[in-house]
């Protein structure tokens, strides 16, 4: 092993951006890092990949008209390029996922259909099509179509008859007043109190990741987020006693994620 390489749970990596209490952040191109990871080493993957919305449009934020351009990482020139991007990272993610592991992928109408197709093309079986119904979506400024108030989260496992994915049915039922948990989840956008460490354009609320992690992992499991952004997956993973690796190519977002993980380490 070279001087600048580390081992984490059997996963070979270069020196991490952050490494404390089994919480790892890596500054890297996702494709490059995934290709170096140990095969079948992760119990669960949560991904919120680029939505490819940055096309010069406008949206609403706090009553103000704002650009939807999020950065070069969210721009793409064609559907073919978008779909190849999704197929490539999903193919690499499959290699590092354990035989009984699962992957969750969040998206909007702008990319989720490509994601769903890519999952099936790369040998996954989709288990659920979760609809996240937002109680306080941004208003529709154009008034030319229905207000976008939902996002989709696909849950999938490898398309292998021998695969036995984990689902904590009893806990989900308990959290839903003794009734079976349905595939429509209702809740607010990310609260301001969760955005204290800095701004990220697509930060997910902690309650969403809490349900996902509790439903599909056990304490001590390895969770990977290949587009970690502001670090919500890692924060909730730490809180729930899971081990975590997060990857991002943008240092400005890793700084936010590190602040949040440091705060979580101090309190838990």
UniProtKB/Swiss-Prot annotation:
Keyword hit for Methyltransferase: yes
Gene Ontology terms describing biological process: DNA restriction-modification system; methylation
Gene Ontology molecular function, alphabetical: DNA binding; N-methyltransferase activity; site-specific DNA-methyltransferase (adenine-specific) activity
Tree of life domain: Bacteria
Catalytic class of the enzyme: transferase
InterPro entries: DNA_methylase_N4/N6 (IPR002941), DNA_methylase_N6_adenine_CS (IPR002052), RM_Methyltransferase (IPR001091), SAM-dependent_MTases_sf (IPR029063)
Reactions catalysed, as given in the entry: a 2'-deoxyadenosine in DNA + S-adenosyl-L-methionine = an N(6)-methyl-2'-deoxyadenosine in DNA + S-adenosyl-L-homocysteine + H(+)
EC number(s) given by UniProt: 2.1.1.72
Gene Ontology CC annotations of this record: cytoplasm
Bridged cysteine pairs (disulfide): none
Subunit field text: Homodimer.
PANTHER family associated with the record: RNA METHYLASE-RELATED (PTHR13370), TRNA (GUANINE(10)-N2)-METHYLTRANSFERASE HOMOLOG (PTHR13370:SF3)
Function: Further methylates DNA that is already methylated at 5'-GATC-3' sites. Essential for establishment of a previously unmethylated plasmid transformed into the cell as single-stranded DNA, enhances plasmid transfer to DpnII-containing strains of Streptococcus pneumoniae.
Family according to the record: Belongs to the N(4)/N(6)-methyltransferase family.
Listed name of the protein: Type II methyltransferase M2.DpnII
Organism: Streptococcus pneumoniae
């Amino acid at each position: 092993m070279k001087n600048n390489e580390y081992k984490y749970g059997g996963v070979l990596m270069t020196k991490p951006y952050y490494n404390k209490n089994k919480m790892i952040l890596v500054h890297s191109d996702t494709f490059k890092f995934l290709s170096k990871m140990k095969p079948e080493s992760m119990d669960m993957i949560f991904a919120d990949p680029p939505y490819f919305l940055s096309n010069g449009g406008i949206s609403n934020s706090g009553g103000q008209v704002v650009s939807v351009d999020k950065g070069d990482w969210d721009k793409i020139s064609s559907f073919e390029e978008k779909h190849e991007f999704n197929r490539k990272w999903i193919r690499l993610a499959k290699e590092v996922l354990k035989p009984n592991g699962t992957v969750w992928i969040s998206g909007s109408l702008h990319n989720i259909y490509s994601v769903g197709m890519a999952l099936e093309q790369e040998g996954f079986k989709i288990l659920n099509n979760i609809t996240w119904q937002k109680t306080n979506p941004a208003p529709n400024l154009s008034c030319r179509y229905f207000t976008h108030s939902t996002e989709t989260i696909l849950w999938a496992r490898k398309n292998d008859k021998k695969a036995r994915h984990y689902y904590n049915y009893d806990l989900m039922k308990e959290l839903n007043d003794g009734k079976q948990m349905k595939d429509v989840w209702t809740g607010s956008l990310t609260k301001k109190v969760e955005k204290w460490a800095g701004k990220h354009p697509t930060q997910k609320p902690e309650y969403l990741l809490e349900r996902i992690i509790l439903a599909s992992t056990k304490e001590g499991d390895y969770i990977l987020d290949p587009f970690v952004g502001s670090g919500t997956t890692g924060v909730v993973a730490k809180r729930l006693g899971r081990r975590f690796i997060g990857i991002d190519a943008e240092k400005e977002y890793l700084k936010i994620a590190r602040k949040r993980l440091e705060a979580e380490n101090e309190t838990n």
